[in-house]
Amino acid sequence: MHICIINSIIWFIVKYKKKHGYSLFVEFTHAYGIGEGTSVNMRGVNIGYIKNLQINSNSVLVSIYIKSEKILIPKNSIIETNQTSLFNNTIIDIIPLEKINNYSIRDFNVFNQNCYDLQIFCNNQYIIGDRGLNYDDLIRATTRIAQRFDDPRFFNLFYLFLQNTIEISDDFILTFNNISSMSYYLYIFCRDFLLNNI
């Protein structure tokens, strides 16, 4: 009976410790395909998810849940949305731009009032997010390039460039052949001159 109670207490403590994370609020100008449950990654590792999403007239406010209070995110970080595949799988990437000194922040946690003076994000802190890699932009840019190549003026200019290049190369080959012929005749002349005068 006592073992069962002790196991229950240990299970509850472990379960409570595992689920004790913190929240951040990130504002984006556009949702870029993110939604509730979207993964949040830092250095390629999943550290949380989107808990809630609120659309305003000029922006989208996202509530991010970080799974553990031990995961410290530097304030000098880029927080951006990225598409990970052609199937429109979107994630939020946190890219730290500097290393933080673990010794200076090891005694603090994200729930402490002094946390705001440190170089890490704190619980319920407000952050502005950016737009990262997006396949829609890539497709638009490719379409624009294809439209430029489809322009007849471009092909006329390209054809003129190729024609001039071919003419220049033909002239270069002719000039090179003339120079090599002249050098051959000069060699024969010098050889005969030297052989006759020696």
Swiss-Prot record:
Keyword vocabulary terms for this entry? Chloroplast, Plastid
GO cellular component term of the entry, any = chloroplast
Q: Where in the cell is it found?
A: Plastid, Chloroplast
Q: Does the keyword Chloroplast apply?
A: yes
User: Which superkingdom, per the lineage?
Assistant: Eukaryota
Q: What is the recorded name of this protein?
A: Uncharacterized protein ycf22
